[in-house]
Amino acid sequence: MNAALEKLSQTINGTVQLDPLSKALYATDASVYRKIPLGVAFPKDLNDLQRIIQFCNDHSVGLIPRTAGTSLAGQCVGDGLVVDVSKHFTEIISLDLEKKQVTVQPGVIRDELNDYLAPHGLFFGPNTSTANRCMIGGMVGNNSSGTTSIKYGVTREKIVSMKAVLWDGSTAEFKDLSSDAFKDKMLEASAEGQIYKGIYNLLSPLEIQSQITDAFPKKEIHRRNTGYAIDLLLEADILGGDAPFNMAHLLSGSEGTLALTTEITLQLDDLPPSYAAMVVTHYNSLEDCLKDVAPVMKCNLYTCEMMDKIILDCTKSNREQSENRKFVEGDPAAVLMLEVRAFSEEALQKNLLQLQNEIKTS
């Protein structure tokens, strides 16, 4: 296999690393899992991606897309060929200020994107704890959320469209499709056409739709990455719903198992209000903490995060984090961290008062 991979390296503009050190570095992500890959490919362009896919098809090799590798559950770990797009697919392609949309390649870092957007009064809302190094492609693959998901939603909800390379090396753009446009796609003899035909045949039977509706987590639960989001596809008008069909919603959260993404268009939000405050409520039991969540969520929060005693105790003996826990009073069983924001100091104080009153009466 090494000889074949070396030959592949000679046919692409990028590189394929086969040395033991490179394999060891890419054998894990930010998780505890470890598998030595066959090699690591660094494609430079679309043609490289297509050649890599053709190689994997010809040699029955698994393909593992990867960006920053900050995932915590082994999403980009495997014994196939790792395809790292973080090195060359790093361009912010375009910004549409009127539509408040930006198009990027998957290797763009989340915080660097927001640095670019800030002068325009815009930002990309989902904010993982690794926002200064995680990349948009990985956020799409994982359907990342972050602390402000209660206000700005998850990554899937921000995706307007995606361009991708499919299993046969052909390209496709996934975006909102009307019922008529969906039917036209089904008539195509391409790989993309096969996808739409397959989706329709799989999901159109009412019995299947009923099983999906009954078995999948409630849509009201924002952070619910439990496999392919086929339940969301049922909202499309072609399948009996009232929304356009968008395959990008299925790609988000699929962890790179369905296609290689080359471009992502995102819907942006206005920058959040600049006046902010954090209220930290302390509890003697985890149950009391959880009971307060529903009442305080009525107060237009930007963040609502819980830390229990296990996490709090871990920070006591950590040299770095012990400096960050000075707000903790006593030895609580749990705390809630509640962020409020406003466009003025006066409005902020009003929001704080509302939150404090809600806490007192809950």
Give the residues covered by each predicted segment.
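N-terminal flexible segment immediately upstream of the FAD-binding catalytic core
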Residues: M1-Q54, D58, A68-K100, S129, ...
